[in-house]
């Protein structure tokens, strides 16, 4: 779970919520799979414990995902092979499945959300496609190294470069101003490495896990076309 699932009514703290649904529930699921006879498994995690380890113990979400990742990989044994794939920001398209955030990005880049300010936040990050994640997951299930945390990724972009790809794909090219303001679609509350942070790295195990790279621009073009026609 992430910030989207945290109750906003004050009924539970983020720390307690993440502890229950991540730290406790996810390892319990993998333990049940192991007891049921599953011999190989892959945990889909987040890149923050590896690229923003300074946030462990400081940010409840990053702390929780780190705890969960370590607990799952600790189950590795001669009879149970388990590794984790730690992902950056993921994008992809499944026909018939609408993602509100993607729909909002398309509308924003198309100029349909004229009430929102047009700019880019500071910093940037790595992105990967859901297709590449599927390829890596299949490979990891087949021959992933037990107990290993793989840091996956495709391309590094500043938020300015990334958003300008959306505007270009929407037929509304822009040279975006970079501001320190909270962005309406990429707010600081989801920037778990820290507001304005730049997360840039060379992905691991690209050949070992045989996943495609340099797919971001083409995927954005596909998404804009699909959502514009919906």
Residue map of PLM features:
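Active-site beta-alpha turn of Rossmann-fold NAD(P)-dependent dehydrogenases/reductases
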Residues: 1, 42-46, 86-88, 153
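NAD(P)H-binding glycine-rich loop region in Rossmannoid oxidoreductase-like domains
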Residues: 1-24, 52-53
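A short helix->loop->beta-strand "cap" motif at the edges of active sites that frequently abuts
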Residues: 35-40, 79-80
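Conserved beta-loop-beta element that borders a ligand/cofactor-binding pocket
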Residues: 45, 71-97
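Glycine/proline-rich active-site loop of Rossmann-fold NAD(P)-dependent oxidoreductases
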Residues: 92-106, 140-150
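Mid/C-terminal beta-alpha module of Rossmann-like enzyme folds, strongest
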Residues: 124, 130-194, 207-230
């Amino acid at each position: 779970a992430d910030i989207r699932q945290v109750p906003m009514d004050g009924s539970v703290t983020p720390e307690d919520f993440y502890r229950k649904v991540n730290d406790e529930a996810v390892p319990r699921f993998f333990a049940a799979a192991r007891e049921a006879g599953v011999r190989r498994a892959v945990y889909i995690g987040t890149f923050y414990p590896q690229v923003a380890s300074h946030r462990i113990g400081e940010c409840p979400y990053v702390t929780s995902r780190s705890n969960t990742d370590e607990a799952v990989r600790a189950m590795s044994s001669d009879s149970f092979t388990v590794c984790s794939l730690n992902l950056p920001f993921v994008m992809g398209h499944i026909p018939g499945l609408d993602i509100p955030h993607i729909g909002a990005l398309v509308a924003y880049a198309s100029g349909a959300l004229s009430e929102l300010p047009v700019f880019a936040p500071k910093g940037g990050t790595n992105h990967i496609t859901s297709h590449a994640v599927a390829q890596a997951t299949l490979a990891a299930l087949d021959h992933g190294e037990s107990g290993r945390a793989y840091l996956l990724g495709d391309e590094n972009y500043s938020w300015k470069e990334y958003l300008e790809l959306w505007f270009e794909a929407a037929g509304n090219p822009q040279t975006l101003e970079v501001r320190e303001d909270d962005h309406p679609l990429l707010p600081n509350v989801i920037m778990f490495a820290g507001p304005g942070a730049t997360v840039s790295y060379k992905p691991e195990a690209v050949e070992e896990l045989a996943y495609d790279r340099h797919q971001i621009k083409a995927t954005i073009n596909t998404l804009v076309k699909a959502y514009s026609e919906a």
